């Protein structure tokens, strides 16, 4: 049986035609799912009993099963299980006056960043569109009256390596009949796959959302050590692509920079980062992210003094920047950490 949340509105209209249903019925169903977050055909009361029966015989809703919900003052971490028994992480970030949802796009990751817990287990597979959307639906159902305002593709996986499914999820998110999110409220974070960035630049849907690029180093050699994909996606070519990437008015590309003690956090590194950006200050803003400590990774967080020194250099050069301390440290909030803990406990339990 198919998952109905795998379909964009246009696709669902075509699918409904094949079932003998009028295309406008797809809009009705979309509104129930994405406006009221009803995931039970029996409750869709503007459909006839016959139509509800037909839909329930052909479609189902939740490809994810909620395993765990761990709450801290500034974030809620959800663990979901797929039908093939993989674990997916989702984080709901509590901002001052709204919520931001951090969704995963893959199970594991093939990029292999040495500072990321998700990379420890390698890539298992891409998430389907339904699995991406179901993260949103189940968290919103859990929230009730309060609404998710922003979505960031910054969870497990490389979104641009799962391009088609991520794009379909974005289409559902921005559809006026779907989640109806502003494109400005959606951010895709990528490690910098150059071929996919070029594809994104030509894509009328994808190029309109916010773009964040995980930079993390200011030289080819240093970036290769932290992010092995840099060997085939060079820093030089990446910056060239970003400097010509088509941007909506008043929008900037975010350069994400994970600050790691003794690795990339020196004043000299900050000066090199400023030089890398050069005259394109109005095109970029820098998101400084102090490393979130993990017992499985050989890195440490810089001191607050060193973080401030790094930031001061960027301000000196007129580069817009901010420091983002990881939300949800109490609940293993960084990418892949709670999943890794859960897998470790399951393995230990099996051994016992």
Regions found by a protein language model. Name each.
Residues 92-93, 165:
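Residue-level structural signal for beta-strand termini and adjacent loop
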Residues 69-70, 104-105, 189, 214:
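Short linear Ser/Thr-Pro motifs
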Residues 140-150, 155-317, 322:
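Conserved AdoMet/S-adenosylmethionine-binding subsite of the radical SAM
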Residues 94-134:
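Canonical Radical SAM [4Fe-4S] cluster-binding loop centered on the CxxxCxxC motif
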């Amino acid at each position: 049986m198919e998952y109905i949340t795998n379909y964009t509105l246009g696709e669902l209209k075509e699918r409904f035609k094949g079932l003998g249903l009028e295309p406008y019925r797809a809009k009705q169903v979309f509104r129930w799912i994405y406006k009221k977050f009803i995931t039970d055909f029996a409750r869709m009361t503007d459909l006839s009993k016959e139509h509800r029966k037909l839909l329930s015989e052909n479609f189902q809703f939740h490809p994810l099963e909620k395993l765990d919900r761990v709450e801290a003052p500034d974030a809620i971490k959800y663990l979901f299980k797929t039908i093939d028994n993989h674990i997916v992480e989702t984080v709901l970030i509590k901002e001052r006056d709204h919520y931001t949802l951090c969704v995963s796009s893959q199970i594991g990751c093939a990029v292999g960043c040495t500072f990321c817990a998700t990379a420890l287990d390698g890539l298992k597979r891409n998430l389907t569109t339904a699995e991406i959307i179901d993260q949103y639906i189940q968290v919103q159902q859990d929230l009730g009256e309060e609404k998710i305002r922003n979505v960031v593709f910054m969870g497990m996986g490389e979104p641009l390596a799962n391009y088609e499914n991520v794009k379909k999820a974005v289409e559902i998110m921005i559809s006026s009949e779907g989640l109806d999110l502003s494109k400005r409220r959606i951010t895709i974070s990528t490690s910098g796959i150059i071929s996919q960035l070029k594809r994104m630049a030509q894509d009328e849907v994808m190029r309109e959302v916010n773009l964040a690029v995980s930079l993390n180093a200011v030289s080819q050699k240093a970036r290769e050590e932290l992010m092995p994909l840099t060997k085939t996606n060079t820093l030089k070519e990446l910056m060239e692509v970003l400097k010509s990437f088509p941007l909506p008015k008043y929008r900037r590309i975010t350069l994400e920079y994970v600050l790691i003690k003794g690795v990339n956090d020196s004043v000299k590194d900050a000066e090199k980062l400023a030089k890398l950006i050069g005259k394109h200050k109005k095109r970029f803003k820098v998101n400084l992210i102090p490393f979130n400590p993990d017992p499985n990774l050989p890195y440490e967080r810089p001191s607050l003094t060193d973080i401030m020194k790094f930031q001061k250099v960027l301000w000196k050069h007129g580069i817009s920047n901010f420091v983002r301390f990881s939300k949800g440290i109490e609940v293993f909030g960084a990418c892949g950490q709670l999943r890794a803990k859960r897998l470790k406990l399951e393995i230990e339990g099996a051994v016992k």
